[in-house]
């Protein structure tokens, strides 16, 4: 336990460890080309601190495009051409980040760009540069029996 951990953070950490951590790690391992273990995740305190400093919103939206979910080559081409720095250090965020913690990754090359629709249950994957200069949101969904992917860069 971190000395600065609040009761609410401790509750989330313990609840997340029991209820979400195994599935969270499984999702991360499907989405990345590296093996992810629980000790690689940021603490709840550090995760909260990092996320509190993020101020991306519709006013800071730099780029948005909707593509077919299956077109992973186009996804990678767009992201490579629009992001400031593909090789920067990023934080990866999935649905249960508040209970399990952010995952620091060395760059976007470790991401499995050929991921499957069911690899992330909520349909949202977020990458935030560790220097907080940029955020990439991959939001995928099904509509009228077709699968789409929204790419948003802030």
Placement of each model-derived feature along the sequence:
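Structured alpha/beta or helical-core interaction and ligand-binding surfaces enriched in interleaved
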Residues: 1-143, 151-154
């Amino acid at each position: 336990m971190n000395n600065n951990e609040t009761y609410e953070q401790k509750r989330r950490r313990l609840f997340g460890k029991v209820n979400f951590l195994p599935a969270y790690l499984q999702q991360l391992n499907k989405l990345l080309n590296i093996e992810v273990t629980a000790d690689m995740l940021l603490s709840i305190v550090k995760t909260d601190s990092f996320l509190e400093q993020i101020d991306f919103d519709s006013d800071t939206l730099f780029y948005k495009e909707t593509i077919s979910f299956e077109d992973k080559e186009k996804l990678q081409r767009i992201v490579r051409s629009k992001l400031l720095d593909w090789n920067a250090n990023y934080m990866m965020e999935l649905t249960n980040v508040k209970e399990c913690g952010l995952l620091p990754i060395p760059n976007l090359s470790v991401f499995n760009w050929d991921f499957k629709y069911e690899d992330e249950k909520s349909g949202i994957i977020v990458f935030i540069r560790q220097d907080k200069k940029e955020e990439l949101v991959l939001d995928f969904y099904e509509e009228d029996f077709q699968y789409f992917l929204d790419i948003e860069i802030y």
